[in-house]
Each structure stands twice: as structure tokens, then as C-alpha cells.
Curated annotation (Swiss-Prot):
It comes from Neosartorya fischeri (strain ATCC 1020 / DSM 3700 / CBS 544.65 / FGSC A1164 / JCM 1740 / NRRL 181 / WB 181). The keyword Membrane does not apply. Residues 1-20, 425-507 are annotated as: Disordered. SMART domains: DEXDc (SM00487), HELICc (SM00490). One of its GO terms (molecular function) is RNA helicase activity. Residues 258-418 form the Helicase C-terminal domain. This is ATP-dependent RNA helicase dhh1. SUPFAM superfamilies: P-loop containing nucleoside triphosphate hydrolases. The keyword Hydrolase applies. Gene3D superfamilies: P-loop containing nucleotide triphosphate hydrolases (3.40.50.300). ATP-dependent RNA helicase involved in mRNA turnover, and more specifically in mRNA decapping. Is involved in G1/S DNA-damage checkpoint recovery, probably through the regulation of the translational status of a subset of mRNAs. May also have a role in translation and mRNA nuclear export. PANTHER family: DEAD-BOX ATP-DEPENDENT RNA HELICASE 50 (PTHR47960). Residues 78-248 form the Helicase ATP-binding domain. It catalyses: ATP + H2O = ADP + phosphate + H(+).
């Protein structure tokens, strides 16, 4: 009798073990990312996601999204967040901060309740879309509803959606406050309050809104703040609104180890020529090019297209639906280059970006840090190139000193090992659309301009502005602008505008 019970118990244990192994084998796992990684994400304690004792359904979403092991910020944050304690976390850009708060937030959601149980605030609309998509992807087996709400979209649509159960609300502060003030978004039983890019959200323009939003939450809420930089204003918020927060600081150095930084002294009128040279010499998978103003963004995007390179652009003055489309298409590899303002400096995660170019050098170290952090995501390699004029030399020195980093003069030839991967096809597709194939391919650097134009565009070299898309791709009418003649910031007249963008030279 005892032997029979022992055999039955042994068979049951083996069956459970086999079942434990089988559930992972049945997952729709993405191809393994074979690119090397730096210690920014590999210097861990050796924990596995299973060590956090989270729901199997959540682990299924984690593994199917391509996550393999937790990064340092995830190791430090997830176990503490699961206890409900307030957290103040500081870590480098691109090291896994989003998953560090999304995973414990998802774990604590009760899908049987119809109440909103978590509010995640971010400073920009693009980051709100990206964060909500991460929540949906990781939590796709949990049976929960995630809603994103931002300014620039119809308020009535949000009101209709909030009539149904919304477990996690992701949005920008102004729109969420509007919904809460109208009694549409009920946060009275919402125990989790998360702020990503908290330094931006606690700037003077947002702080009053944040404090009003907190008043709609229960007093025993959990508050979690995440950012790469924490100014003094964060300490003031912590002392006023957080209860004995667990503080995490993984910023032993400020810049990502995988990003190589260079500068080139260039006269203003030679910047476009220098950019053209970089395009012809570098092996770019995808690049983001930053300008300091929206006017320069549009002018530069047009000039890049005239040089024969595919190009999108995005800035804050565009309609939200157009910004969303540009962001979506660029993430999915429709276009190789994106020119933008500082709209996309925070949190935007596009794994395929291996080159960031500061066409206009930023004015402060914080902006510089966030800009270059768009490459080298999650411990991978990247390149940051800064085009410096004579007036920028003091900012260059100041930023080097404040960040404790070295920005080197650009060499004649840049070693491809610093930013190029042996197998670029192994770069993960966007988490928001893992099934959509990439549409860009590598163009040889020595290809002629005409060949590049044919390679990058299916439109036989016609480069009218694609209305409403923020891209110069050869379709549609131009965006109408002021008809009066004005002088652009490159020192040249923009001319008359009548439905097409100006053909004035950028340099």
C-alpha cells in the first residue's frame, strides 16, 4: 500500500514537472536577439522571472514578448513593487524601466473587478501609446483592459470607452485630470499611481496637475516614480506625497556604455553637407536626427529627401493622428530616417535605431542624455554624432563635465564594430506589431544618389510632401503654410507657400 502511494506521488510530481516544462514549449516565442549586450543590462544578480512568483499568464506574455531575464532595474524594482511599497527608481535610458513597473502593476490587477486599478502617467502622447502597448502585450493572457488617453484626441471617445471596464489607464496628465474632474474616470479605488519620466512630470508646468490627480486616489495608494534624472523638485514631491519610499539608484554613470559619442566642428552652412557625408559613410539601420526647433525639423527633412534619402519628420505642431502614424510607421521600419524636435527624446524605444545625430546641439545635459539614449537600447551598441558650431563649444564642455563623459572628435573612419551588428535581421520587431515585416533594407554606402533615391522610394523620385504624414515620400499635396515670405533660421528666404513646402535651401 505504501509503495503504491509512493509510486502515485512520484508519478504526480513527474507529471507536474513535465507540465511545467510543456507550457513554455507551447509559447509563440520570437527569434532570439543575438546582438551582444553591455553591463548596463547584463550586470544582474542572476534572478529569473520565475523567481518573482508571478502569475503564469503574466510570464507567458513576458516570454512571448521576447524577454529572457530581468535587467538590473527590473531585479531591484519588481520584488519591492509587488509588496505595495512606494518606489523612487533611477536608472539609465533603455535599461528596462517600463517593464520594471508594468510587470508588478499587471500582477496586482484583479481582472474580475471592473474598477480602474492603476494609473500610469507619461509626459508625451507617443510615450503613452508605447507604454499602453507594452501593458497590452505583456498582459495579453490576463484578461485585462488597458486604455490610453491623451490630448489631441476626441474626449467623447474616451468617455464612451470608460463606460466599459478599464483596469489600467495610461495617459498624459492634462487629459486624465479632465476625465477625473468630470467624474468620467473613477480613481477612488485605484491603488497604483505610476509616473514614468517623473522629472518631466514634476516640472512646474505639470506639478499642479499631478497633485490634483493624487487627490482622486485613495490615501493608501502606491506611488512609483521612474526616471533617468531626478532634480531637486522630485525630493520635494517625495517628502510631501510618498510614504517611506524604497529608493533605487543604478546611475553609477550617466551615459549608456554601448553608445560611442563623437563631435564634428561644422560651420552652420556646411551642416547639411556634413550630414550627407555621414549618410554615405555610415551603415545606418535607422537613425533619429534632432533639431532645436520645429521650423528646422521641416526644412531639414525636406533637404534630406532632396539628397535622395527616405525621411519622416515629427514635431509638436503636427496633428496628433499624423504624429501617431509617423511614430507607428517608423517603428515598423517603413522609413530609415526620422527628423524630430525634442518631442521624442523621452522613453521612446525603437530597437533598430543605431545612430543618433544632433544636427542642432542641445542646450543642456539633461536633453543631451535623453537624446542619445534613443540609440543603444537595452544594452546594445549605438552611435551619437554631434554637429557643433563655434557657439556650441561651451555647451559641449559643460555637458561633458556634468555627465562625466567624453565626447571625442569624429575620426576619418568609424569602426563598424562600435554600432553595426553582424546580423541586423535579428533585431526584434516592435513590441506593438511583432508580425509586421520590416520594409527597409540596407543600402550600400557607395550607391549613387539616383540609385539611393530609387532604392528608398517607390515613387520615381517625386518628393512632394505627403500631407498629414510628416514625411517626404512623394504622395499627396503639400502642407499649406503662411503665404508671406519669411527668413528661415538657416539664413535663407523661405519664399511663397501655396500648398507645397518651400524649396528654399537649408544651407
Amino acid at each position: 500500500m505504501a509503495d503504491a502511494l509512493a509510486n502515485q506521488l512520484n508519478n504526480t510530481s513527474l507529471g507536474e514537472a513535465n507540465s511545467e516544462m510543456r507550457w513554455r514549449e507551447q509559447l509563440n516565442m520570437p527569434a532570439k536577439d543575438a546582438r551582444p549586450q553591455t553591463e548596463d543590462v547584463t550586470a544582474t544578480k542572476g534572478l529569473e522571472f520565475e523567481d518573482f512568483y508571478i502569475k503564469r499568464e503574466l510570464m507567458m506574455g513576458i516570454f512571448e514578448a521576447g524577454f529572457e531575464k530581468p535587467s538590473p532595474i527590473q531585479e531591484e524594482t519588481i520584488p519591492v513593487a509587488l509588496t505595495g511599497r512606494d518606489i523612487l527608481a533611477r536608472a539609465k535610458n533603455g535599461t528596462g524601466k517600463t517593464a520594471a513597473f508594468v510587470i508588478p502593476t499587471l500582477e496586482r490587477i484583479n481582472p474580475k473587478s471592473t474598477k480602474t486599478q492603476a494609473l500610469i502617467l507619461v509626459p508625451t502622447r507617443e510615450l503613452a501609446l508605447q507604454t499602453s502597448q507594452v501593458c497590452k502585450t505583456l498582459g495579453k493572457h490576463l484578461g485585462i483592459n488597458v486604455m490610453v488617453t491623451t490630448g489631441g484626441t476626441g474626449l467623447m471617445d474616451d468617455i464612451i470607452r470608460l463606460n466599459d471596464a478599464v483596469h489600467i489607464l495610461v495617459g498624459t496628465p492634462g487629459r486624465v485630470l479632465d476625465l477625473a474632474s468630470k467624474g468620467v474616470a473613477d480613481l477612488s479605488e485605484c491603488p497604483t499611481f505610476v509616473m514614468d519620466e517623473a522629472d518631466k512630470l514634476l516640472s512646474p508646468e505639470f506639478t499642479p496637475v499631478i497633485e490634483q490627480l493624487l487627490s482622486f486616489h485613495p490615501k493608501d495608494r502606491q506611488v512609483m516614480l521612474f526616471s533617468a534624472t531626478f532634480p531637486l523638485i522630485v525630493k520635494s514631491f517625495k517628502d510631501k506625497h510618498m510614504r517611506n519610499p524604497y529608493e533605487i539608484n543604478l546611475m553609477d554613470e550617466l551615459t549608456l556604455r554601448g553608445i560611442t559619442q563623437y563631435y564634428a566642428f561644422v560651420e552652420e552652412k556646411q551642416k547639411v553637407h556634413c550630414l550627407n557625408t555621414l549618410f554615405s559613410k555610415l551603415q545606418i539601420n535607422q537613425s533619429i536626427i534632432f533639431c532645436n526647433s520645429t521650423n528646422r525639423v521641416e526644412l531639414l527633412a525636406k533637404k534630406i529627401t532632396e539628397l535622395g534619402y527616405s525621411c519622416f519628420y515629427s514635431h509638436a505642431r503636427m496633428l496628433q493622428q499624423h504624429r501617431n502614424r509617423v511614430f507607428h510607421d517608423f517603428r515598423n521600419g517603413v522609413c530609415r530616417n526620422l527628423v524630430c524636435s525634442d518631442l521624442l527624446t523621452r522613453g521612446i524605444d525603437i530597437q533598430a535605431v543605431n545612430v543618433v545625430i544632433n544636427f542642432d546641439f542641445p542646450k543642456n545635459a539633461e536633453t543631451y542624455l535623453h537624446r542619445i539614449g534613443r540609440s543603444g537600447r537595452f544594452g546594445h551598441l549605438g552611435l551619437a554624432i554631434n554637429l557643433i558650431n563655434w557657439d556650441d563649444r561651451f555647451n559641449l564642455y559643460k555637458i561633458e563635465q556634468e555627465l562625466g563623459t567624453e565626447i571625442q572628435p569624429i575620426p576619418q573612419n568609424i569602426d563598424k564594430k562600435l554600432y553595426v551588428y553582424d546580423s541586423p535581421e535579428t533585431i526584434p520587431r516592435p513590441i506593438s506589431n511583432p508580425s509586421q515585416p520590416r520594409q527597409i533594407t540596407n543600402t550600400p554606402a557607395n550607391t549613387s544618389t539616383a540609385d539611393r533615391r530609387h532604392h528608398n522610394h517607390p515613387n520615381n523620385g517625386q518628393y512632394q510632401f505627403n500631407r498629414g504624414r510628416g514625411s517626404y515620400r512623394g504622395r499627396g499635396q503639400g502642407q499649406r503654410r503662411s503665404a508671406q515670405t519669411e527668413t528661415n533660421k538657416f539664413g535663407h528666404p523661405q519664399g511663397q507657400h501655396s500648398g507645397k513646402t518651400s524649396t528654399a535651401p537649408v544651407s
